């Protein structure tokens, strides 16, 4: 007789190999065909709402690994919240306006297209990019409203953005003024703080002499009768700002010295600088010197000095006063700072505080980085090309004390990677410290209070965002571009004042934009709205900062507080969002701009919590770089290993810091995935012939180890769900993997194989095991589904067509309409957990002893062994309570418990009996049945009798 055929060997259509790269696209297609996202929405309707608002990626170029991390994390959260009993929509979005797309249009079609053509081509280009990115995001297994995403260039979004601008204008936050702003010559526009990055750069550092212009005043300040000729010396790394110098700054409390230098410099023997910098500076200049008098900076306020190029050209025949400033330091230089108010924020504030008007500020640098032609000596030159010319002119004028090359971290445009400057321009600002119209807190005050009311994951994000808001300047809202939402103001041609009906006019423009897009503003004849007043006003040509685009999506998409704007997806979503989730750079980007617009419009943040993830680096911790050759593209991983492996990598990595990825790291992820898949395959194979409706054993009648397994599963599920609740995915993955490999694979399933395979197919012993396995399988699949979406769906379809095929409340379409599994509670759960925890510890000790004997050649498999356990007290009672089932727990052919004092003692003896050909146990009764001499008595009764007596394991 072929006894192998009498075993209940497992069988399942769920394959051992996932073949993920080949099979995943079919699942993506099936989810679309079956309208799975819509099915989730229908199943979730009426539940408490959870809103994760998608930070929009920019609609330009293929997605990179950072995009994949971001979208997978969002997908895990949305799926886990839906399965936890929430109504969690996912509406993906795209950021569509702005410079990068405008640059692409210029590259393709040239720089001199009419604005209407630029806008039309930019809109078409953005749609092409969105289609490419959407395909890649869907390939990652991300479910969402892909057919109806929000786009910042949707007409309704553009219109509501204009309404949002009107809202903050009415509340008193918006003003126009001249201020130094971050300016990129390549963009030809102001930049937001978030668009500035820093890179090392070498610049000339110069020490420049400003000759004395008020010697009597200087003598009096130092308590001297008179002074000889001389100069005050400044240090700067921006020689190009010297032509625009209008003041000098000293610290009121620092001590300044008059030094008689030898040999005498060109402007005279006396030099003025900070006392603490005298020795270092004289050494650098190759001079000897003697301090003849000192005075505090406060005594020097208002003194005047000639421009260092006054002798070179009459255009520089002016003097610069000393203004006092606490920001002057002694870290480098001379303790005296030269001030060109058009090109530095502190310089600007200082000069304005001392009465300099906007019209008085010298601003010779044009938007393209060249000096105005009217500038003496350097007109028409690029400021970078002018640096050496200015240094030569200073030298010729006798005003150059020293020049060195300095490598330092300097501001660059994040798009062009070129250096930028501060440049005073007339811009529209949102004031951080202006009192709003209602007299309430300033924007800075309300934003800082909002940060305190927001939850942060990880917690350090709070301090980071707080510091940024506390120290940031006013927000430059305006940009000088074509592809952007217009600041649709009518400005008086003579006074520069806004039209008195601006609020009403903005709404009228918004209504037109709602129908025809921002192009409606471009084509609008002012007479249509202003009538006879049109000749007095001009259309403002500025566009809104793209960070205002994305920063107002909480209003334009979610609808704003109390659905004030009735956003594009306000019916599905809600305000404020429960969560914003982006990379750590968004503390100065989307988190930041959204906070400011939320506080301006509604007095509070548009989110309840912020989650930040780190950047992706290679296995050595290096930034991804094409030049280094360490870039890992998500498309390539999906096409080779499968998107499931990327999802598992994301979930199993601590995203609060940098996320490391490499081929070697992905190999380890693949190994972890295989172990999980093998566990699932075993579970599915062993419930394939089980029917949940007609064959389930009541929970109170389950074998003891089966009840323990369900208790163990419930504990694991509670831990994983707690991790999900806190967005801690890597410990959740670790717990799931440990459960599969140790709790199931190395313990419960290992013990269960004998009962599943050898007892009668319909016996209580086997059905008890299958009842527990089915609950475990359902719980496990649902817990894995948010992360291993493809695999969980594949396994669920197998389960739904086998063990669950007759269960009415089970989804046949998708696992994602399910909620987390309700595991049965047991009154003795704590006692079960404690008992079996000790039994597992004893089992581990027995396994170590068995391995020693196996290594020594005494036995082959553990079933060849017989075990004698010597124990007293609780251990003896524990072991004895299992009766003959103890041998199945230990996976040996005999296990006998003996009363003994002291610690547990284990003795292993190779069995002297024959091996049963069916169950492989070595038993005394093998051959006792004449009709079946090859098998043991237990197998005989399982095959031909009432079945073995057994109720523990």
Curated annotation (Swiss-Prot):
Xref: PROSITE patterns: AA_TRNA_LIGASE_I
One GO CC term, this protein: cytosol
Pfam families documented for this protein: Anticodon_1 (PF08264), tRNA-synt_1 (PF00133), zf-FPG_IleRS (PF06827)
Presence of the UniProt keyword Transmembrane in the record: no
Primary enzyme class: ligase
Motif 'KMSKS' region mapped to chain: 623-627
Motif 'HIGH' region mapped to chain: 57-67
Binding site for L-isoleucyl-5'-AMP: 582
GO molecular function annotation: aminoacyl-tRNA deacylase activity; ATP binding; isoleucine-tRNA ligase activity; tRNA binding; zinc ion binding
Presence of the UniProt keyword DNA-binding in the record: no
Keyword terms of this UniProt record: Aminoacyl-tRNA synthetase, ATP-binding, Cytoplasm, Ligase, Metal-binding, Nucleotide-binding, Protein biosynthesis, Zinc
Gene Ontology BP terms: isoleucyl-tRNA aminoacylation
Co-factor: note: Binds 1 zinc ion per subunit.
Catalysed reaction, written as an equation: tRNA(Ile) + L-isoleucine + ATP = L-isoleucyl-tRNA(Ile) + AMP + diphosphate
Family: Belongs to the class-I aminoacyl-tRNA synthetase family. IleS type 1 subfamily.
Matches recorded under PANTHER family: ISOLEUCINE--TRNA LIGASE, MITOCHONDRIAL (PTHR42765:SF1), SOLEUCYL-TRNA SYNTHETASE (PTHR42765)
Physiological role: Catalyzes the attachment of isoleucine to tRNA(Ile). As IleRS can inadvertently accommodate and process structurally similar amino acids such as valine, to avoid such errors it has two additional distinct tRNA(Ile)-dependent editing activities. One activity is designated as 'pretransfer' editing and involves the hydrolysis of activated Val-AMP. The other activity is designated 'posttransfer' editing and involves deacylation of mischarged Val-tRNA(Ile).
Comment on protein domains: IleRS has two distinct active sites: one for aminoacylation and one for editing. The misactivated valine is translocated from the active site to the editing site, which sterically excludes the correctly activated isoleucine. The single editing site contains two valyl binding pockets, one specific for each substrate (Val-AMP or Val-tRNA(Ile)).
Full protein name: Isoleucine--tRNA ligase
Organism field: Bordetella petrii (strain ATCC BAA-461 / DSM 12804 / CCUG 43448)
């Amino acid at each position: 007789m072929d006894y192998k055929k009498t075993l209940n060997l497992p069988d399942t259509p769920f394959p051992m190999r996932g073949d993920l790269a080949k099979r995943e696209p079919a699942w993506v297609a099936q989810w679309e065909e079956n309208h799975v996202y819509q099915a989730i929405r229908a199943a979730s309707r009426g539940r408490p709402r959870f809103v994760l608002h998608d930070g929009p990626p920019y609609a330009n170029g293929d997605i990179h690994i950072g995009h994949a991390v971001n979208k997978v994390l969002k997908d895990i959260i949305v799926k886990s919240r839906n399965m936890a009993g929430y109504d969690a929509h996912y509406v993906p979005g795209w950021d569509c306006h702005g410079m990068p797309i405008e640059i692409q249009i210029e590259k393709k079609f040239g720089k001199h297209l009419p604005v209407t053509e630029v806008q039309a081509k930019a809109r078409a280009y953005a749609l092409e990019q969105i289609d490419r990115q959407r395909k890649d995001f869907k390939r990652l297994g991300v479910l969402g409203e892909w057919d109806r995403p929000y786009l910042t260039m949707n007409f309704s979004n553009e219109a509501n953005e204009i309404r949002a601008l009107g809202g903050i204008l009415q509340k008193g936050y918006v003003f126009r003024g001249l201020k130094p702003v971050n300016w990129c010559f390549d963009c030809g526009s102001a930049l937001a703080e978030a668009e500035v990055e820093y890179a090392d750069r070498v610049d000339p550092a110069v020490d420049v002499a400003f000759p004395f212009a008020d010697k009597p005043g200087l003598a009096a300040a130092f308590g001297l009768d008179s002074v000889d000729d001389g100069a005050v010396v400044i240090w700067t790394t921006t020689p190009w700002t010297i032509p625009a110098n209008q003041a000098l700054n000293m610290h009121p409390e620092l001590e300044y010295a008059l030094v008689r230098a030898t040999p005498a410099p060109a402007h005279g023997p006396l030099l003025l600088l900070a006392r603490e910098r005298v020795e270092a500076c004289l050494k650098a200049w190759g001079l000897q010197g003697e301090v003849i008098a000192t005075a505090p900076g406060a005594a020097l306020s208002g003194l005047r000095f000639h421009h260092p190029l006054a002798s070179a050209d009459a255009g520089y025949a002016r003097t610069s006063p000393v203004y006092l400033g606490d920001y002057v330091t002694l870290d480098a230089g001379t303790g005296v700072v030269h001030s060109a108010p058009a090109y530095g924020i502190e310089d600007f504030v200082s000069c304005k505080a001392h009465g300099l008007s906007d019209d008085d500020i010298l601003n010779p640098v044009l938007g393209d980085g060249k000096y105005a032609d009217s500038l003496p000596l350097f007109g028409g030159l690029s400021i970078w090309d002018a640096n050496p010319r200015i240094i030569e002119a200073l030298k010729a004028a006798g005003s150059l004390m020293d020049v060195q090359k300095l490598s330092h971290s300097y501001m660059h445009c994040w798009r062009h990677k070129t250096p930028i400057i501060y440049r005073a321009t007339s811009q529209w600002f949102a004031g951080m410290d202006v009192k709003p119209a209602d007299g309430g807190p300033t924007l800075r005050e309300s934003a800082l209070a909002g940060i305190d009311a927001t939850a942060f994951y990880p917690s350090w994000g709070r301090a980071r965002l707080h510091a940024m808001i506390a120290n940031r300047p006013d927000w430059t809202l305006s940009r000088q571009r074509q592809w952007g939402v217009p600041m649709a103001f009518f400005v008086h041609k003579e006074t520069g004042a806004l039209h008195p009906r601006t609020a009403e006019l903005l709404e009228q423009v918004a209504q037109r934009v709602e129908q025809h897009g921002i192009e409606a503003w471009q084509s609008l004849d002012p007479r249509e709205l202003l009538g006879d007043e049109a000749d007095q006003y001009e259309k403002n040509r500025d566009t809104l900062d793209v960070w205002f685009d994305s920063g107002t999506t909480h209003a334009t998409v979610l609808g704003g507080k109390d659905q004030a704007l009735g956003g594009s997806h306000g019916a599905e979503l809600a305000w404020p969002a429960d969560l914003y989730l982006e990379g750590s750079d968004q503390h100065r980007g989307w988190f930041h701009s959204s906070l400011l617009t939320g506080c301006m419009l509604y007095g509070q943040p548009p989110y309840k919590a912020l989650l930040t993830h780190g950047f992706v680096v290679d296995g050595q911790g290096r930034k991804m770089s094409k030049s280094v050759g360490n870039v890992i593209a998500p498309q390539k991983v999906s096409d080779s290993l499968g998107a499931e492996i990327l999802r598992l990598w994301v979930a199993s990595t601590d995203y609060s810091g940098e996320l490391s990825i490499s081929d070697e790291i992905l190999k380890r992820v693949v190994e972890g995935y295989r172990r999980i898949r093998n566990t699932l395959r075993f579970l599915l194979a062993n419930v394939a012939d089980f029917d949940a409706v007609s064959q389930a054993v009541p929970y109170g009648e389950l074998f003891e180890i089966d009840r323990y397994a369900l208790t163990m599963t419930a504990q694991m599920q509670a831990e994983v769900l707690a991790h999900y609740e806190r967005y801690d995915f890597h410990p959740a993955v670790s717990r799931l993997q440990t459960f599969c490999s140790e709790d199931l694979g190395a313990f419960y399933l290992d013990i269960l194989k004998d009962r599943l395979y050898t007892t009668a197919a319909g016996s209580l012993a086997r059905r008890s095991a299958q009842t527990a396995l089915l609950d475990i399988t359902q719980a496990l699949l649902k817990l894995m589904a948010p992360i291993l979406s493809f695999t969980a769906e594949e396994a669920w379809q197998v389960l739904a067509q086998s063990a669950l095929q007759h269960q009415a409340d089970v989804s046949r379409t998708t696992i994602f309409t399910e909620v987390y599994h309700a595991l049965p509670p047991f009154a003795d759960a704590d006692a079960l957990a404690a008992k079996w925890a000790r039994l597992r510890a004893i089992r581990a000790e027995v396994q170590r002893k068995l391995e020693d004997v196996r290594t020594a050649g005494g036995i082959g498999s553990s079933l060849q062994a017989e075990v004698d356990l010597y124990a007293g007290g609780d251990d003896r009672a524990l072991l004895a309570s299992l009766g003959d089932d103890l041998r199945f727990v230990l996976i040996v052919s005999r296990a006998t418990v003996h009363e003994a004092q002291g610690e547990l003692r284990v003795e292993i003896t190779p069995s002297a009996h024959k091996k049963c050909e069916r169950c492989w146990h070595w038993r005394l009764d093998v051959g006792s049945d004449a009709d079946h001499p090859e098998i043991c008595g237990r197998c005989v009764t399982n095959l031909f009798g009432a079945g073995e007596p057994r109720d523990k394991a």
